Amino acid sequence: MKCATLFLVLSMVVLMAEPGDAFFHHIFRGIVHVGKSIHKLVTGGKAQQDQQDQQYQQDQQDQQAEQYQRFNRERAAFD
C-alpha cells in the first residue's frame, strides 16, 4: 500500500514537471531524499523492535537467575 502510494505521488510529480524547466535534477534529488527517508523509517522501526526484544530477553534471563538463586537459598535452608 505504501509503495503504491509512493509510486502514484512520484508519478504525479514527474508528469507535472515540464521538460523545458530543467527541473529534473531537483526531481531526482527529491526521489533520493524520499527513498532515504523511507529507508530510515523502515530500519529505524526494526532497530527499535530489536532493542525491545533484547531488553525482554535480558529481563527474562535476570528473572530466571533470581528464581534460581531463591531456590538455592531455600534449599540450603532446609539442609
Curated annotation (Swiss-Prot):
Keywords: Amidation, Antibiotic, Antimicrobial, Secreted, Signal. The keyword Transmembrane does not apply. The keyword Secreted applies. Pfam families: Antimicrobial12 (PF08107). One of its GO terms (biological process) is defense response to bacterium. One of its GO terms (cellular component) is extracellular region. This is Dicentracin. Its main location: secreted. Residues 48-67 are annotated as: Disordered. Residues 47-79 form a propeptide. Residues 1-22 form the signal peptide. The modification Glycine amide is found at G44. Belongs to the pleurocidin family. Disulfide bonds: none annotated. It is found in: Secreted.
